[in-house]
């Protein structure tokens, strides 16, 4: 039995992988106290393995960074600061005497999609998630490419323009980034129907852009254009067979995926990249779980 664990800022999910399918997925609260969290986690693992611990062969974990991937230790997580130094790999290996493998959540999701989702059948897969943040992971022949400093594919930090300001991709194209950009432009005097709302979120910006609001349309257009800049960078660097896009902003094709395809066709230099294979991811919330369990694939 291989267990996959998806650690999030507020909840942690655990499942086992059997014949390529997730079985018996359960979740617990991600406690801020790492000791209490570990106690809850081991209680849940015991439920999965039952009395015969010999059934357990490995535990894979996908978790938010920063992480010391060499040692499986958490660093200063923005949402879980008290976890700094939490050696989850060492603790689990000590309790269960099985190998434990830890990856950042974007890479785990990329592996899950490559092996069990939209990347099945492709030798090279680049996965992007666009949601409250932006993450990316590169998979070659069903293996995660980490890079020399474990930073391969971290496109969220790509330098981009943000309406005349030097910025990075996450601040222009993630959900919160889109909202902040719209708020900033309104504060600088640009008119928008968004000002009539009692607060607004990414869905509101997108909805007003659909209705023809000029400011909302400009913000969404730039968010997509900067994502295209990131996609072209990946295409030029590693030339993957398929680029998968997941996360909340990929749910509606006309929000990000179709604009990315259109702009890619308009701006990419090489003809194969202008018609690159851009697809919607398939596994969504289960991608990290699939990927965590797949850290033990042959």
PLM-predicted stretches and their roles:
Residues 26-28, 78, 148:
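Short hydrophobic alpha-helix segments
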Residues 120-173:
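Glycine-rich phosphate-binding loop of actin/hexokinase-like ATP-binding domains
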Residues 30-32, 82-83, 151-154:
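A short acidic/small-residue loop/turn micro-motif
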Residues 73-85:
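A charged helix-plus-loop insertion that forms the helical arch/lid used to bind
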Residues 100-104:
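General beta-strand structural signal in soluble alpha/beta enzymes
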Residues 109-110, 121:
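Hydrophobic alpha-helical segments within soluble ligand-binding/sensing domains
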Residues 1-58, 67-73, 90-98, 115-122, ...:
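ATP-binding/phosphotransfer module of carbohydrate and carboxylate kinases, centering on a glycine-rich
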